[in-house]
C-alpha cells in the first residue's frame, strides 16, 4: 500500500490519510485497506467511509481501543494485495444529452471550443472511476473527465436540479441522484432512480466501481423511464478484470471477461 498517516476523528473514528493527491493508485490503496480490514473481522469496527485520499474507519471504543485499531490497520496494510486481479464492476448509466435534458450543453461546448456533439462524444467515451460518494445520497465523485470538458460552475446556482441530472463542474462530472439546488453545468439526464432507500442496496454502485455513460435518444429515454417506473428495467453492470496499471480514464488495465449482470 501507499504510505499513510493516522489521525483521530473524535472518539469513535480514525482517518487513514494517504498522499495529498487524487490518483487511481491511491484509490486502489484505500479499497485494498478496506477489504483487508473487513477480511480480518476486527472486533469493534462498525463501518468505513472511503473518500478521495482517506479511509475513515468507525469503531466502538467500548469494544476496541484507538491503539488496538492502530495496530490492526498496520497489520492490514501489510497484507498482500488482492486487487491486482480482482473483478471490478462497470455500471452503465443511460443518458439523454442536450435539449431540455441538458440546458448547459452549449455553455460547456462554447467553453471547450467544441461542438455540442463533440462534447457528448468525449463525455460518454471514458469509464469513470468512482472515488467516493457524498454531498447527496448516491452522488458520485468521478475521475476521468476529458480535461478539455472542464467547465466552471454556474455563476448563479439553480434552486432546483432534477434527479438524474448529469453535470460538469470544474474537472469533475457527476449525477444528481435526488432533487437539489446546485451550480453544476447540466448536460444530460438519466431516467434511472439512483437513490432507492426502500431497497436493501439503495445504490447501483459503490466507491471503487466504474461508471460508463451510454447515450440514448429522447424516445429511448422515455422507454427506459417507463420500464423504471414499472420496475422492469435491468441496469447493465459489466464485470471485468483490473490489472496493476489500470486507471480511471479508460479501459487501460481492464480486461473484458464477457460477463455482466442486471439490477432492477
Question: What is each of the regions a protein language model found here?
Answer:
Residues 1-264:
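Glycine-rich active-site loops that engage anionic ligands at enzyme catalytic sites
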Amino acid at each position: 500500500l501507499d504510505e499513510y498517516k493516522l489521525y483521530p476523528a473524535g472518539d469513535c473514528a480514525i482517518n487513514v490519510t494517504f498522499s495529498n493527491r487524487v490518483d487511481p493508485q491511491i484509490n486502489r490503496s484505500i479499497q485494498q485497506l478496506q477489504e483487508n480490514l473487513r477480511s480480518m473481522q476486527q472486533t469493534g469496527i462498525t463501518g468505513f467511509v472511503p473518500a478521495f485520499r482517506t479511509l475513515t474507519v468507525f469503531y466502538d471504543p467500548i469494544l476496541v481501543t484507538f491503539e488496538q485499531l492502530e495496530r490492526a490497520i498496520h497489520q492490514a496494510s501489510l497484507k498482500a494485495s488482492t486487487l491486482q486481479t480482482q473483478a471490478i464492476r462497470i455500471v452503465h448509466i443511460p443518458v439523454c444529452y442536450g435539449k431540455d435534458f441538458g440546458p448547459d450543453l452549449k455553455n460547456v461546448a462554447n467553453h471547450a471550443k467544441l461542438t455540442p456533439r463533440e462534447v457528448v462524444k468525449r463525455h460518454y467515451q471514458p469509464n469513470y472511476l468512482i472515488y467516493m460518494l457524498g454531498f447527496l445520497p448516491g452522488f458520485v465523485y468521478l475521475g476521468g473527465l476529458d480535461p478539455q470538458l472542464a467547465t466552471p460552475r454556474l455563476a448563479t446556482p439553480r434552486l432546483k436540479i432534477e434527479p438524474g441530472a448529469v453535470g460538469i463542474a470544474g474537472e469533475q462530472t457527476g449525477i444528481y441522484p435526488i432533487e437539489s439546488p446546485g451550480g453544476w453545468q447540466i448536460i444530460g439526464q438519466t431516467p434511472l432512480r439512483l437513490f432507492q432507500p426502500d431497497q436493501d442496496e439503495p445504490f447501483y454502485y459503490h466507491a471503487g466501481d466504474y461508471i460508463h455513460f451510454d447515450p440514448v435518444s429522447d424516445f429511448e429515454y422515455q422507454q427506459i423511464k417507463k420500464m423504471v417506473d414499472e420496475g422492469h428495467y435491468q441496469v447493465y453492470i459489466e464485470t471485468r478484470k483490473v490489472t496493476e496499471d489500470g486507471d480511471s480514464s479508460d479501459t487501460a488495465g481492464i480486461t473484458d471477461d464477457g460477463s455482466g449482470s442486471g439490477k432492477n
